[in-house]
Amino acid sequence: MKKVTAMLFSMAVGLNAVSMAAKAKASEEQETDVLLIGGGIMSATLGTYLRELEPEWSMTMVERLEGVAQESSNGWNNAGTGHSALMELNYTPQNADGSISIEKAVAINEAFQISRQFWAHQVERGVLRTPRSFINTVPHMSFVWGEDNVNFLRARYAALQQSSLFRGMRYSEDHAQIKEWAPLVMEGRDPQQKVAATRTEIGTDVNYGEITRQLIASLQKKSNFSLQLSSEVRALKRNDDNTWTVTVADLKNGTAQNIRAKFVFIGAGGAALKLLQESGIPEAKDYAGFPVGGQFLVSENPDVVNHHLAKVYGKASVGAPPMSVPHIDTRVLDGKRVVLFGPFATFSTKFLKNGSLWDLMSSTTTSNVMPMMHVGLDNFDLVKYLVSQVMLSEEDRFEALKEYYPQAKKEDWRLWQAGQRVQIIKRDAEKGGVLRLGTEVVSDQQGTIAALLGASPGASTAAPIMLNLLEKVFGDRVSSPQWQATLKAIVPSYGRKLNGDVAATERELQYTSEVLGLKYDKPQAADSTPKPQLKPQPVQKEVADIAL
């Protein structure tokens, strides 16, 4: 009996010692100036900015997976488009009088020019290497059929010619010309079908995963930067001095560590909302999220791939979210060309591709449940669209492909599940809650923590989004002569608009094209087109947009 008692006492002491050791390990605080949560393109971009602006600041990046750029930034988990509104028709909505609004298109294009300048600067510094590994010239095209859609594209083309950012765009309604631009799209098509297309040679395909890996690899060369993989944030607590204590679990050995940070950035993609809620800042209460996934059909058949060099976007059908429009794209992934068609919406309660089925439920709180319900009730057409997408059969997806590639063969294509996108739902005083397309930087009043919510245009505008975050959180420093000079070295057009300034637009496009190895020819005169008939549009309930 004494032996048993002694054994139990010994085990209890041992377990207590292990427990105390674990607690001691968790209580050992690592201190850092900046904590970057998430190993994607947003954290990598912000870290790169801060490395130039404040090289002495210490930075720590924590990533839940075993490597960086494995979620939404991964090339296979997104469309890889350098979004600049050259072909995306949802950025040029039609007004009630039939005219075309280009304000959103101009803003998107301006933002992408900042990304191009940021990447070019990093190439010149040796931070990014071999531009062809992450960005390639792929012409951007819009393609439509039917009298009304052709008339819309005419009006869109005419409206965009008023901006210096869209000079060089071509327009045609000629079958032979469009076939020369995009053979796959035209071969086998009814020669009597009314079609129209625009084409811009300076479009790009971008591998955001490769950019992310290279940016982080450069950051790792500095002794005051630390990357911790397989590390999951479990808790965030504000301290009395407005620093943050963040508890991080090592998923490989089960230990925990506390990191004390002066500034925290939550760039965790779909997981950002839950972490923002965990922080307890009042600004988080206005937000909820709704996850939507995307699938693509993929072809690696050389007969298909070598016959198509463009990204071709169509027009969304009536009742579908504008951003959901199908497109057939040349991609450069893992060093080789492939063709993708989609996206097709999917549904999962996960906020990340590698997330938990409990993500949606665990992010629903008493403060955001009502906005979510209002969005569902106000956007029944969107709900119907998502249900119809989830119910698509293999044959349905193939028929959708044949609208863009009439001679497609089933055996050339396979289905790929891309990443998850968490759509922003924000509390609204009038409607209760609204679905917001785009990204949004949410920060506390003290500027000690910030999160990026939303999905589109996302990675292609990482540089301007993080620039916006710097202005919002580090406003005093941004206005200082030192930071101003550095930011203008990184982004030459910082603080001014390119739109309307032909010389400045051409200068920046020429510069970034040369450094990034992209095609650029000075624009010629605009194509002559039939005059669009601006017909008043019937009043229709606006369909909320989502990003896939």
From Swiss-Prot:
It catalyses: (S)-malate + a quinone = a quinol + oxaloacetate. Keywords: FAD, Flavoprotein, Oxidoreductase, Tricarboxylic acid cycle. Residues 521-548 are annotated as: Disordered. Its cofactor is FAD. Belongs to the MQO family. This is Probable malate:quinone oxidoreductase. The gene is mqo. NCBIfam families: mal_quin_oxido (TIGR01320), PRK05257.1-1 (NF003603), PRK05257.1-4 (NF003605), PRK05257.2-1 (NF003606), PRK05257.2-4 (NF003608), PRK05257.3-2 (NF003611), PRK13339.1 (NF009875). Pfam families: Mqo. It is an enzyme of class 1 (oxidoreductase). Pathway: Carbohydrate metabolism; tricarboxylic acid cycle; oxaloacetate from (S)-malate (quinone route): step 1/1. Its EC number is 1.1.5.4. HAMAP family: MQO. Residues 530-541 have a biased composition (Low complexity). GO terms for molecular function: 2-hydroxyglutarate dehydrogenase activity; L-malate dehydrogenase (quinone) activity. It comes from Escherichia coli O17:K52:H18 (strain UMN026 / ExPEC). GO terms for biological process: tricarboxylic acid cycle.
